[in-house]
């Protein structure tokens, strides 16, 4: 063992006979699952910034020969840029960017001997005692936008790098790409003619050396390696680069000297360096897009994904012709304009982040699904009033909207930029009986037990997240629905706040539901119809509306609760909703004082299930290079509703080439959820409207 002057260990195994146990022939290899790292930002939305990677981690390099069959690979990337003459006035010897290229290329050529990098580290460590490693304690890493906490593994993989340099390799074993924990991979000075698309699986790589091979192109999947800081391609036969390299927004050094690179690409890196070339590839990335009316000249870099499958869970209910017995609900966090910045989403082209571009994609998606109810989060006031309310009115939608609490007291122009929750419903199908706003912070301080509870004022009251509640009645069947549209706080440092917000939401819904159970029957249920123009055929008469349903108690009313809860399955907020109670001593409360909620616990009377729980939840609802998890839900009261169909997951093959959203096909970092429900047998009784004494 050799000691180092800093924490952590750097040990490289060069693949010699003395280290055969580290070879690739490992019969039962299990890689550890490492959760993505997020830098916390002082904003309610996810900031996908990457902090500088800590260098004090372990590196053991294991190399052994990889004798295997040639992997299946069909290059398909698009050649970009036309050949033009590079500015002859550039003095390569004086340009700092190209000077660095020449220096790094020279160093690369000196590293052609077998296992050069492993041997170099071994020589540096010779005679130095390495302190035994200690298991790392579990550290929680927050998602900067959505507040989901991902726990690091309690122990780390013992090695994070492989050196296969100078081995004369002509092909790579597919087993190599199962080592998803790798951070450094040296494949330099071999005889590789192609890099398998499976390279995209090694998403933790920050250093990849492919110098001195016979590569003529790179696969599109290279764009999945968004943690790359160094990519060395010296001395190959590469003429062009895939546009997907534009996703490599953290790349600091791209080595291309010794390649017949086309003049356009070479000019960018010579004049302005790696960052400029990556930005060029990102911003010039074509897209295949045909449903947007924005006048763009677009071509295909890869086809859009197949439509998400419509998963039918109950064929009898889903195929029923009685549409009034069913209700479809869509929930979507649209990523508000103020949060969609290059600093948060550096992998996305500027025009993809443009609100004018994204809002049209969102509108088209909403129209294509044509759901009965739409719940949108992160819609600012300006977008609701000036775009979505007007546009969706053409599709028979009426809307209810509230901004977050910070909009109060702002100037009108400033308030337009504050996001909130918007709920739309089909006006021809539903009657709006009531609407309510739940401001979690303001509701908390009005509680009788809030006096003397400092945490309510210091932690909860300062957060202005909200829920919008609408009470609807189906014009034809008389069935009533409570529809909730909520957006919870994201920051994992305030997990107690997120839990208390959930508890307050359920407490307020309990009160509202009891009020709605006593709501009088609706007397005028006829939908507005335009006058028939001359010569226009008669429209078929509507069925006679059924009388309003009455419910014995609030928990009997069908309840649909949608939103971005910023909570993964198994979290405290999730468990409270799903199980109806949570102990007062739950660790997420951290012994803080929140009145009776932290003294006697939290409960609610509803029997709620996650709609997507019927299929074990989706793989994710939020997708970025550093974070992939379930944050969004459609909850339903299982005693009064039955889920009959769901919108499925995003195509897995498509995701092999797309490191994160938003992009040309997905306008938000969240995806839309869509579920179809059927109303179960009536628990209440039918009540005829009382019109008073009638004359004969």
From Swiss-Prot:
Q: Where does Mg(2+) bind?
A: 378
Q: Where is the composition biased (Basic residues)?
A: 34-50
Pfam families the UniProt entry points to = Exo_endo_phos, LRR_14
Compositionally biased residues, Polar residues: 96-113
Q: SMART domains this protein is in?
A: LRR_TYP
So which cofactors does this thing need? Mg(2+)
Which superkingdom does the taxonomy of this entry point to?
Eukaryota
Q: May I have one GO cellular component term?
A: P-body
The record lists the catalysed reaction(s) as: Exonucleolytic cleavage of poly(A) to 5'-AMP
EC number(s): the record gives 3.1.13.4
Please provide the record's keywords in A-Z order.
Activator, Cytoplasm, Exonuclease, Hydrolase, Leucine-rich repeat, Magnesium, Metal-binding, Nuclease, Nucleus, Repeat, Repressor, RNA-binding, Transcription, Transcription regulation
A molecular function (GO) held by this record is: poly(A)-specific ribonuclease activity
Cystines in this chain = none
**LRR-type repeats, residues:** 181-202, 204-225, 227-248, 250-271
Region called Disordered, residue ranges: 30-56, 95-126
Q: Which GO terms describe its biological process?
A: DNA replication; DNA replication checkpoint signaling; nuclear-transcribed mRNA poly(A) tail shortening; positive regulation of transcription elongation by RNA polymerase II; transcription elongation by RNA polymerase II; traversing start control point of mitotic cell cycle
Q: Report the PANTHER family cross-referenced here.
A: CARBON CATABOLITE REPRESSOR PROTEIN 4, POLY(A)-SPECIFIC RIBONUCLEASE
Record family assignment: Belongs to the CCR4/nocturin family.
Q: What name goes with this protein?
A: CCR4-Not complex 3'-5'-exoribonuclease subunit Ccr4
């Amino acid at each position: 063992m050799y000691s180092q002057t800093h924490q952590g260990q750097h040990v490289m195994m060069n693949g010699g006979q003395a280290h055969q146990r580290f070879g690739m022939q490992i019969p039962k290899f299990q890689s550890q699952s490492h959760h993505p790292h997020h830098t916390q930002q002082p904003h309610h939305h996810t900031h996908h910034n990457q902090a500088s990677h800590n260098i004090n981690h372990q590196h053991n390099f294991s190399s052994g020969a990889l004798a295997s069959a040639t992997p299946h690979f069909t290059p398909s990337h698009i050649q970009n840029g036309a050949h033009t003459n590079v500015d002859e006035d550039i003095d390569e010897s004086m340009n700092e960017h190209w000077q660095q290229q020449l220096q790094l290329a020279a160093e690369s050529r000196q590293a052609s001997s077998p296992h050069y990098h492993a041997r170099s580290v071994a020589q540096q460590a010779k005679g130095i005692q390495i302190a035994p490693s200690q298991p790392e304690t579990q550290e929680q890493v927050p998602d900067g936008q959505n507040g989901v906490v991902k726990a690091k593994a309690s122990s780390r993989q013992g090695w994070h790098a492989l050196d296969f340099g100078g081995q004369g390799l002509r092909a790579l074993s597919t087993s190599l790409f199962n080592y998803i924990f790798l951070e450094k991979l040296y494949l330099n000075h071999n005889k590789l003619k192609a890099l398998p698309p499976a390279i995209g699986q090694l998403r933790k790589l920050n250093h990849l050396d492919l110098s001195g091979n016979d590569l003529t192109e790179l696969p599109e999947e290279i764009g999945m390696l968004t943690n790359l800081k160094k990519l060395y391609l010296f001395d190959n036969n590469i003429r062009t680069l895939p546009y997907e390299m534009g996703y490599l927004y953290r790349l600091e050094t791209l080595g291309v000297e010794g390649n017949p690179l086309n003049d356009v690409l070479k000019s960018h890196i010579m004049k302005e360096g790696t960052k400029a070339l990556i930005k060029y590839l990102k911003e010039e990335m074509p897209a295949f897009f045909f449903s947007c009316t924005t006048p763009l000249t677009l071509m295909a870099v890869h086809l859009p994904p197949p439509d998400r499958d419509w998963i039918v869970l109950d064929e009898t209910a889903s195929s029923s012709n009685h549409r009034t017995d069913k209700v479809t609900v869509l929930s979507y966090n649209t990523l508000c304009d103020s949060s969609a910045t290059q600093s948060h989403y550096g992998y996305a082209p500027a025009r993809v982040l443009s609100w004018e571009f994204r809002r049209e994609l969102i509108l088209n998606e909403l129209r294509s699904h044509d759901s009965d109810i739409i719940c949108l989060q992160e819609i600012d006031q300006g977008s609701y009033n000036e775009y979505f309310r007007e546009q969706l009115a053409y599709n028979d939608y009426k809307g209810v909207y509230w901004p977050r609490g910070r909009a109060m007291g702002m100037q009108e122009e400033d308030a337009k930029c504050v996001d909130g929750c918007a709920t739309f419903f089909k006006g021809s199908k539903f009657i709006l009986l009531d609407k309510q706003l739940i401001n979690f912070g303001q509701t908390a301080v009005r509680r009788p037990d809030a006096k003397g509870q400092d945490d309510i004022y210091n932690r909860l009251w300062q957060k202005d997240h909200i829920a919008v509640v609408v009470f609807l009645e189906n014009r034809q069947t008389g069935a009533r629905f409570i529809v909730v549209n909520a957006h919870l706080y994201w920051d994992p440092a305030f997990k107690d706040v997120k839990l208390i917000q959930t508890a307050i939401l359920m407490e307020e819904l309990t009160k509202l539901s009891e009020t709605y159970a006593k709501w009088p029957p609706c007397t005028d249920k006829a939908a507005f119809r335009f006058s028939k123009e001359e010569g226009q055929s008669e429209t078929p008469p509507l069925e006679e509306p059924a009388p309003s349903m009455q419910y014995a108690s609030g928990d009997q009313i069908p309840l649909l609760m949608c939103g971005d809860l910023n909570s993964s399955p198994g979290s405290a907020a999730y468990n409270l909703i799903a199980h109806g109670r949570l102990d007062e001593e739950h660790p997420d409360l951290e012994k803080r004082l929140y009145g009776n909620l932290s003294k006697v616990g939290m409960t609610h009377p509803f029997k709620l299930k996650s709609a997507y729980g019927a299929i074990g939840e989706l793989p994710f609802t939020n997708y970025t290079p550093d974070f992939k998890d379930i944050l969004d839900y459609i909850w339903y009261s299982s005693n009064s509703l039955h889920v009959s169909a769901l919108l499925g997951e995003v195509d897995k093959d498509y995701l092999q080439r797309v490191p994160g959203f938003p992009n040309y096909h997905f306008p938000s970092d969240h995806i839309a959820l869509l579920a179809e429900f059927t109303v179960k047998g009536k628990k209440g009784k039918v009540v005829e409207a009382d019109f008073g004494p009638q004359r004969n």
